């Protein structure tokens, strides 16, 4: 395979000399063996000398014959695939001369012709069609045979193939506007009526993406294409939906029926719904029937009449005027561009019923989602990291791997098996179309018409599957060659398809509601909403004007541009129309009254300081008024004229900031500057009174918030996420323990948590956290003076009933013990592995009255570990049975000292116990391990890899491949491990995928953790592991033997890593775990012996000097010598061994 790999690489990189050299030997051997000729004309299959001759000499020649010209890599690419994709014409010619087959499909069913057409290389396309030894069937589709496709007729729906898109080369060329390739394919009598899996013809794709020249070519060659429409769509509908007015005009001039009706209605429905005013005018001028209804019984006018954007009202006026003939188009344009008066009174919204508006828009969204599978044929082209998304993804940015990965994460998809730094260049830029020059004002539409396609979206959950099925996905693995000058100037040929430019991303996140993002996929929506959906349409409460000002009048009052106009002045004629920003219908605007604007000057702003910058980059969803505590509300407010004078902020500065509010920092700076003069004391007192009165109003609104908040808490996490437009993260939150809306408050869910669970988009994280602030915080334990009566009732209040058994079995049976919990214990002792559940518990214990844990290392004698031989067969998750605790680190210092005091009840001996403890501490501050050379004489190293504390209080994790396990019938130490390694290596040679696990090693044992989902698979206690060794034949492979306590059988578990050094470190860490466990056992025995000695002393006369203990104990155990003498004793085992059998009982580790 070495030569074939070289050939594949040379073809991919365009190394012509290397290709010729590798194939030169093949031509010689082919001619000598009697195979096909050098030009490849002799073999019917183009195989040449590839085993076609039955001469015995051919088998001998195979040993030195050149590489197979049709060899394939893991993606199914032949050298011809690589050369065609990357535009290496000379290499293609050489491969064709050497009998390269042109009709070999890759793993996604693509021929080299598909790749060349997608790339837009007309010369290579002609080469593949005309010069190949086997004439490429130009009409060949990715998977289904032609006879199957033609069985039901070329224009009827047919069977969808699951592993391809059923696209011809003409589809690929038409979609990207490769005019020359389309010409070449049409010259070969390519059938342009074929449809892909989503029933789209090449003409549909060209109309969808605005490829004007391709549309003209296809219509000129096959005028009958205009009659090949389906109930799903027509070219006219697709072009109208995306505002390609030139394409619309060409289709109408060619005779396409403008009144053709699909499930979504007429082309006028499409253009009106997606705000394409120019297309609406063209269709009206062409005499389209405005009374056509869609499948919901709505006309185009009904669809846009109630949508609250100026663009929709403009289109509605166009249609109405066309029906009545009252005004001309120019008059409508002049009317639409006239500025509307400033909307200040939100009572004007009242005639617009929230229920009717919400119902209308929701029905549109639900209808699109219902037909998502049929209507979203190119969803994978926008979301998946595939061949079609290689074109810089409509951003104009450098198309490196980082930007692509970021783009894939934003859509929730990522291509599997993508090699780093390998990416083919995008196809050559198609000729600019007339439609691409059209731009829509982004003030009203976040996505320009040419930057966003209104392709019907799939539901989010289907995106990964679609990506997996896309036949061009693996093109990412095709090339390492970097883009040259195209990187800086490449524009996506589907720029209107992805709509992911930086500007449009900001606009989309900041202005378009998430419910519409799935509807449009980049097309400019008519319903322009500045923040959370339908929030702007809510009728204000008369008793609480603050809530209504949040979305309507607050921004309007903050945008006064005249320097001399203060908050108490009525709006001037020069003030820009703010109703456009809040997305209200033009007919609902009203003149602002002086009284209402007066009230604005005393309104607490519902947007914190710095929100202006935030609006430019992220979602503008703001918390409801009562989500802030009163004290916080006092820090951010709008200022009246007198207040702004007090703070010496000029009106010009206010206008340039675009807001009448002042941040806390600005207020505090002004206050410090003014407080130097006593004359301002009365003014500041007045300000405080104003702020206090504002707080009272907020208190009233909090009662109302409780009612609406209770409804929110009854939602599921999925419903809550859907309400904020981030339902794609439901699985991430649920799988990580954020599974209850009642416990998603700001003291539970933090930005670091969202980053850890895989939410990489900072704007989405910000929006989640903003929504979480409106949820109630988890109440601290005993916040109301009444603590739960039991641990089960406390866990039940947190919705964590599943952990009751774990808490009780681990010794946490009372609320007092729970108050001392730390996260370390939650993970290692109580096995609360879900992050959201741990954060929920910690938030409940936030205000517990205890001291901080000690910073110095704990005393290991307090571990009170049992002898290894006396351990039960309980799993590693069981806590130490002596105290229910694992270390002093987990105990408050007061509780630790109290426990020591209780163990020595005689006051007369307390001082002696203290003296012994003080003497003991210097030698116990650090556990001393024997070096590897003493612990295991065969070990060639002199030091361990980790500190002992790492294996006691934490764990050492290593990623490895698990090859399998084998029953050991005759235990022979390392010989058994070698036999098992050899057998497992052989059995896994043909496995396509070897499972990856994480070995988590502690002094207690080894855990198997699934690397994909972090679930614990199995646990092996350290006392049951008898031998661990590397495989001498493959040093990346290692194994260890365990004993099954139930059956008494021994099993050898075999693993492999990618690095020899890593394997050696794992073996050494296992050995250190043995040593740590052994030394802790010695420490435990020493502690028990000392306790027995102290007890015997208490039984004697407490007033007399301490006698020498009567047990066979060395004096150093009772009165430890200096630390320099104690350290060697830790390194040796003999210092604690005593001839008496009692002292030997717990030292066996076999």
Swiss-Prot record:
Residues 33-53, 391-583, 602-666, 872-927, 1096-1150 are annotated as: Disordered. Residues 496-505, 538-551, 649-666, 872-884 have a biased composition (Polar residues). Signal peptide: none annotated. Residues 712-778, 786-853 form the SAM domain. The modification Phosphothreonine is found at residue 335. The lineage of its organism: Eukaryota, Metazoa, Chordata, Craniata, Vertebrata. PROSITE patterns: ANK_REP_REGION, ANK_REPEAT, PID, SAM_DOMAIN. Phosphorylated on tyrosine residues in response to EGF and PDGF. PANTHER family: ANKYRIN REPEAT AND SAM DOMAIN-CONTAINING PROTEIN 1A, ANKYRIN REPEAT AND STERILE ALPHA MOTIF DOMAIN-CONTAINING PROTEIN 1. Residues 952-1107 form the PID domain. Pfam families: Ank_2, PID, SAM_1. GO terms for molecular function: ephrin receptor binding. The modification N-acetylglycine is found at residue 2. The keyword Acetylation applies. Regulator of different signaling pathways. Regulates EPHA8 receptor tyrosine kinase signaling to control cell migration and neurite retraction. The modification Phosphoserine is found at residues 524, 636, 638, 640, 642, 644, 663, 677, 679, 682, 693, 903. Residues 398-409, 479-495, 629-644, 912-924, 1139-1150 have a biased composition (Basic and acidic residues). This is Ankyrin repeat and SAM domain-containing protein 1A. Its main location: cytoplasm. ANK repeats lie at residues 75-104, 108-137, 165-194, 198-227, 231-260, 263-292.
């Amino acid at each position: 395979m070495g030569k074939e790999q070289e050939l594949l690489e040379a073809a991919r990189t365009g190394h012509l000399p290397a290709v010729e050299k590798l194939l030169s030997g093949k031509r010689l051997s082919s001619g000598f063996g009697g195979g096909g000729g050098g030009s490849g004309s002799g073999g019917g299959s183009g195989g040449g000398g590839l085993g076609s001759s039955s001469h015995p000499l051919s088998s001998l020649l195979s040993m030195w014959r050149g590489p197979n010209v049709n060899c394939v890599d893991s993606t199914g690419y032949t050298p011809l695939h690589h050369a065609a994709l990357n535009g290496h014409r000379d290499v293609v010619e050489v491969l064709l001369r050497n009998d390269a087959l042109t009709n070999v499909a890759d793993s996604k069913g693509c021929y080299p012709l598909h790749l060349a057409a997608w790339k837009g290389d007309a010369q290579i396309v002609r080469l593949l069609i005309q010069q190949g030894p086997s004439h490429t069937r130009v009409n060949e589709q990715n998977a289904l045979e032609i006879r199957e496709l033609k069985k039901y007729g070329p224009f009827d729906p047919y069977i969808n193939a699951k592993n391809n898109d059923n696209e011809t080369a003409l589809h690929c060329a038409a979609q990207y506007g490769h005019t020359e390739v389309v010409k070449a394919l049409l010259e070969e009598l390519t059938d342009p009526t074929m449809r892909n899996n989503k029933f789209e013809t090449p003409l549909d794709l060209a109309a969808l993406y605005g490829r004007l020249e391709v549309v003209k070519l296809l219509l000129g060659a096959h005028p009958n294409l205009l009659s090949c429409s389906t109930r799903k769509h027509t070219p006219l509908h697709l072009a109208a939906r995306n505002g390609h007015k030139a394409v619309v005009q060409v289709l109408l001039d060619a005779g396409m029926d403008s009144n053709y009706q699909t499930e979504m209605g007429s082309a006028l429905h499409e253009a009106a719904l997606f705000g394409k005013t120019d297309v609406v005018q063209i269709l009206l001028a062409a005499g389209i029937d405005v009374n056509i209804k869609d499948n919901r019984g709505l006309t185009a006018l009904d669809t846009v009449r109630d949508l609250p954007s100026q663009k929709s009202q403009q289109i509605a006026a166009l249609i109405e005027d066309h029906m009545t003939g009252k005004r001309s188009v120019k008059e409508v344009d002049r009317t639409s561009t006239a500025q509307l008066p400033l909307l200040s009174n939100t009572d004007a919204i009242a005639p617009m019923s929230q229920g009717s508006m919400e119902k209308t828009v929701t029905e549109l969204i639900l209808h699109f989602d219902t037909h998502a599978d049929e209507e979203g044929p190119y969803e994978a082209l926008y979301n998946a990291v595939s061949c079609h998304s290689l074109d810089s993804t409509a951003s104009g940015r450098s198309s490196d791997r980082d930007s692509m990965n970021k783009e894939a994460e934003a859509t929730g998809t990522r291509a599997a098996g993508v090699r780093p730094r390998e990416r083919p260049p995008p196809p050559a830029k198609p000729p600019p179309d007339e439609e691409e020059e059209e731009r829509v004002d982004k003030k009203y539409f976040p996505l320009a018409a040419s930057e966003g396609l209104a392709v019907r979206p799939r539901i989010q959950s289907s995106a990964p599957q679609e990506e997996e099925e896309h036949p061009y996905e693996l093109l990412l693995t095709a090339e390492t060659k970097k883009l040259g000058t195209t990187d800086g100037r490449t524009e996506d040929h589907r720029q209107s398809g992805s709509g992911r430019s930086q500007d449009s991303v900001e606009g989309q996140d900041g202005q378009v509601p998430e419910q519409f993002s799935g509807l449009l996929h980049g097309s400019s929506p008519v319903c322009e909403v500045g923040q959370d959906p339908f929030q702007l349409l809510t009728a204000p409460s008369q008793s609480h004007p603050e809530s209504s000002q949040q979305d309507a009048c607050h921004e309007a009052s903050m945008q006064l541009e005249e320097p001399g106009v203060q908050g108490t002045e009525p709006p001037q004629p020069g003030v820009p129309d703010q109703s456009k920003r809040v997305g209200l219908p033009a007919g609902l605007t009203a003149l602002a009254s002086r009284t209402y604007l007066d009230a604005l000057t005393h309104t607490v702003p519902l947007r914190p300081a710095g929100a202006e910058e935030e609006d430019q980059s992220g979602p503008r969803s703001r918390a409801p008024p009562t989500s802030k505590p009163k004290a916080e509300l006092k820090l951010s407010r709008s200022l009246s004229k007198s207040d702004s004078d007090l703070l010496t902020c000029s009106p010009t500065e206010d206008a340039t900031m675009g807001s009448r509010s002042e941040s806390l920092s600005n207020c505090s700076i002004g206050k410090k500057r003014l407080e130097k003069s006593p004359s301002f004391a009365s003014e500041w007192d007045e300000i405080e009174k104003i702020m206090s009165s504002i707080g009272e109003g907020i208190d009233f609104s909090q009662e109302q918030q409780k009612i609406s908040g209770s409804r929110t808490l009854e939602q599921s996490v999925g419903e809550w996420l859907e309400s904020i437009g981030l339902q794609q993260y439901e699985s991430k939150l649920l799988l990580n323990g954020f599974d209850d809306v009642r416990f998603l408050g700001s003291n539970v869910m933090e930005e670091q948590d969202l980053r850890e669970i895989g939410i990489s988009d900072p704007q989405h994280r910000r929006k989640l956290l903003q929504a979480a602030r409106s949820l109630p915080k988890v109440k601290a334990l005993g916040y109301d003076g009444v603590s739960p009566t039991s641990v089960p009732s406390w866990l039940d209040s947190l919705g964590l009933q599943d952990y009751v058994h774990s808490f009780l079995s681990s010794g946490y049976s009372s609320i007092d013990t729970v108050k001392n919990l730390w996260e370390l214990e939650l993970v290692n002792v109580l096995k609360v592995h879900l992050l959201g559940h741990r954060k929920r518990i910690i938030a409940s214990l936030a205000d517990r009255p205890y001291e901080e844990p000690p910073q110095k290392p704990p005393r290991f004698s307090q571990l009170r570990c049992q002898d290894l031989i006396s351990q039960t067969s309980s799993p590693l998750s069981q806590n130490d049975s002596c105290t229910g605790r694992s270390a002093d680190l987990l105990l408050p210092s007061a509780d630790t000292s109290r426990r020591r005091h209780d163990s020595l009840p005689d006051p007369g001996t307390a001082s002696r116990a203290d003296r012994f403890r003080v003497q003991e501490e210097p030698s116990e501050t650090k556990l001393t391990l024997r070096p590897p050379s003493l612990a295991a004489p065969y070990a060639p190293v002199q030091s361990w890899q980790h500190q002992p504390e790492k294996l006691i209080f934490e764990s050492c994790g290593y990623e490895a491949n698990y090859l399998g396990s084998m029953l050991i019938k005759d235990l022979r130490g390392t010989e058994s491990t070698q036999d098992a390694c050899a057998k497992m290596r052989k059995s896994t040679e043909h496995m396509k995928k070897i499972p990856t696990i994480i070995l988590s090693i502690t002094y207690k044992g080894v855990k198997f953790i699934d690397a994909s989902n972090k679930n614990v698979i199995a646990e092996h206690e350290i006392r049951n592991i008898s031998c661990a060794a590397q495989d001498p034949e493959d040093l990346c492979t290692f194994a260890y033997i365990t004993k099954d306590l139930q059956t008494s059988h021994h099993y050898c578990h075999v693993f492999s890593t990618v690095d020899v050094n890593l394997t050696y470190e794992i073996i050494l860490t296992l050995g250190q775990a043995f040593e740590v466990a052994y030394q802790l056992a010695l420490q435990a025995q020493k502690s028990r012996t000392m306790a027995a000695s102290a007890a015997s002393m208490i039984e004697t006369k407490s007033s007399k000097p301490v006698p020498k203990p009567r047990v066979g104990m060395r004096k150093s155990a009772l009165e430890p010598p200096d630390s320099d003498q104690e350290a060697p004793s830790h390194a040796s085992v003999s210092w604690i061994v005593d001839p008496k059998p009692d002292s030997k009982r717990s030292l066996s580790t076999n």
